[in-house]
Amino acid sequence: MKKALLILTVLVAILAIAGCAKPAAKADSMVVKFGVFEPLTGANAAGGAEELDGIRLAQELYPTVTVGGKEYKIELAIADNKSDKVEAANAGQRLVDSDKVQLVLGSWGSGLSMAAGPIFKDAKIPAIGLSCTNPLVTKDNDFYFRVCFLDPFQGTVMANYAFKEVKAKKAVIIREVSNDYSVGLAKFFVDSFKALTGDDKAILAELNYNTNDQDFSAQLTQVKSLKPDVIFAPGNYTESALIIKQARELGITAPFLGGDTWEIAEFINVGKQAVEGAVMSAFFDNDAPLTPLSKVFVDAYQKKYGKLPSGTAVLGFDGYLLAIDAIKRADSIDPLKIRDAIAVTKGFAGAAGYVTLDANGDPIKSAVIKEVKGGKFVYKTTINP
């Protein structure tokens, strides 16, 4: 009798354990992982943090996605690419091999995106670039897409501003030669500015510096002697602010123009009064809503973070929502099916405008021009493609 009772007790215990284990296994299986591939340390950390803020807000507002009538929780697997191309490749590999994500969001910084692009392609994991504007990010990679405008358009926009608004006929370029984004955007500006002026010698000089440089006296001494009408310096926010600050200290008064990477609070924090009047292209303006979701995003961002969002933050938000939209259209969490759904995106309404992707995985979007006034980024105009 005692033996039978003991056997019965053991069986009950086994069944109880099995019964507890089943729901846990089910819960684990009802998850879809979004890899967040961003520079959270290093020279580009402020940009990566802005995009991550947008992604986290989107996750807070939309924490699940329904597939096949079942609700899946969305988890973020965050990989810091450390603002370094080698580390970017390592971070991308971790997302694929260790985190086993269904898709990837990021990165701030075109060179970082390009470093991990082949890894995502080989693993057949779709990636949605947020603010990586260099055309090479998606070129020959049918697993990389994006929600931002491209540098050929951005460079043309700023060249037109220099020619038509500044009335410039001669320009100097100061580029971050170790940065793919800076080199690429500088080239598109140069080509467009020469065409606009009709002068092959409209660019007086193309001067170089490296990421993390602090002293720009050699380049700026040359700029001062050339007396350009305008200076285009499409580099990282920190170095660009230092360049402008040191230029003003040398008595250089020519206006400075830059790209989307300037619209980060750190640009004003570093440059202070010296960057007043600096003009840049940007992705979004809080006072110029483009879709019904624009105001939803701005209000929610202010409530969560206690400040107005940047253009890079809104792209983090939109990238997350595009991923959800693609999963719903695919009705699957299989990466290949998600990729196929992203590729045929048409008229997706994000907070930063509508997204229709072309054969390269790129959208056609407007650019905003902003100017630093009173220590803030102030809207000037919107330029349509």
Regions found by a protein language model. Name each.
Residues 1-33, 67-68, 384-385:
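Short, low-complexity disordered leader/linker segments with a strong preference
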Residues 35-56, 79-86, 108-109, 174-183, ...:
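Extracytoplasmic "Venus flytrap"
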Residues 23-27, 31, 46-51, 61, ...:
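Beta-alpha junction/loop-to-helix N-cap segments that form part of ligand/metal-binding clefts
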Residues 119-122, 186-283:
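Extracellular/periplasmic bilobed ligand-binding domains
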Residues 303-313, 324-376:
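Segments of small-molecule ligand-sensing domains
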Residues 36, 95-109, 128-130, 170-175, ...:
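Periplasmic-binding protein-like
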Residues 244-317, 371-373, 377-384:
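Extracellular/periplasmic periplasmic-binding protein-like sensory domains
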Residues 144-207, 211, 230, 323:
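An alpha-beta-alpha
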